[in-house]
Amino acid sequence: MKRIFSLGLGLLMAAAFGFASAADYPTRPITFMTMVQPGAQIDRLARGLSQRMSDILGQPINVKNVTGSHGTVMATELSRSRPDGYNIGVTSLTAYTYAPHHAKLAYDPASFDFLTLVALNSSGFISKNDKPWNTLKEAFDYHKKNNKAMVAMFHGADDRDAITRIAKLEGVKLSLIPSKGGPSVIKAVTGGHADVGYVGAILYKHVEAGSIKLIAAALGDRLPPIPDVPTLREQGYDEQVEMIVGLVAPKGLDADAKAKLLAAADQLANNPETAEFITGNLLMRPVTWGEDHADQTVRELYDTFGKQAAAMQ
């Protein structure tokens, strides 16, 4: 009888502890995973958001860099995490919207909760400042005229495929090098190992320093800090590459954890200092925050990229 009572008491205490743990979320440090190397613009965004969200939630938030395969390595690890709110991705959406149409993945893109979008990373194609071209079109013309292959370092699958399609259109042989994030692209371009590269808003400080130049804005419009450089479409290429960054969690996120994370995100969305950090400090573009908009954006991008992939077959 004593043993049965002890066992029952133990189960009751365990249940009570489990309930308290869920209701008191967070009770321990949280991890923000990101798919780029330290120092990359999305890494800086993740660290800035981690500090601000930590102040709201009352627990430390550590940043873990999980690089490789354009974000799919990080997405795989995140998909295998418990949906308890202690592992959250701060990542480009391409691993969930673009990659599923072009590679066999170890995860289902439907196995995630998309909590909110946080920023649109300003992005473009760059070259070393002393290269004899000032636009991407001129770069291809130069390589075509001199019968040379172009070496390009890419950031993700979408910009890789965009530059591949452009090279095919121009009739220029392309040699592709994968990267682990913006800093590695900058290093390759300035070191003369790549003729062109694709990066996010990290490009601004290097353009200002004079080590690189922007040769094509990759978004739908020109980048305001460098307004004289035309977009891909303005250079005659029907291409656009957008690096939208969001907060992502494993599917089936604990309800209390989800509510508190969404509430914290809502506070950040309405905080002028956070907006200044994203748009003024990081020079990223503002987006609409919120779970509904994130879900809609992911669905629309997934469908768009699916149709694009089908048309290419």
Regions found by a protein language model. Give the residues of each.
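Short coil/turn segments
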Residues: 37-39, 93, 128-133, 154-158, ...
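Hydrophobic packing residues in well-ordered alpha-helices of helical domains and bundles
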Residues: 46, 203, 294-298
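An extracytoplasmic/periplasmic, membrane-proximal ligand-sensing/linker region
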Residues: 27-29, 169, 255-313
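N-terminal (or domain-start) structured segment
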Residues: 22-111, 146-148, 158-159, 168-198, ...
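Hinge/capping helix and adjacent helix->loop/strand transition within the periplasmic-binding protein
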Residues: 53, 77-86, 100-184, 242-278
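Short beta-strand->loop
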Residues: 108-118, 153, 173-177, 195, ...
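Short, low-complexity disordered leader/linker segments with a strong preference
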Residues: 1-27
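A short C-terminal helix-loop "cap" of Rossmann-like NAD(P)-dependent dehydrogenase/epimerase domains
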Residues: 27, 54-58, 224, 234-243, ...
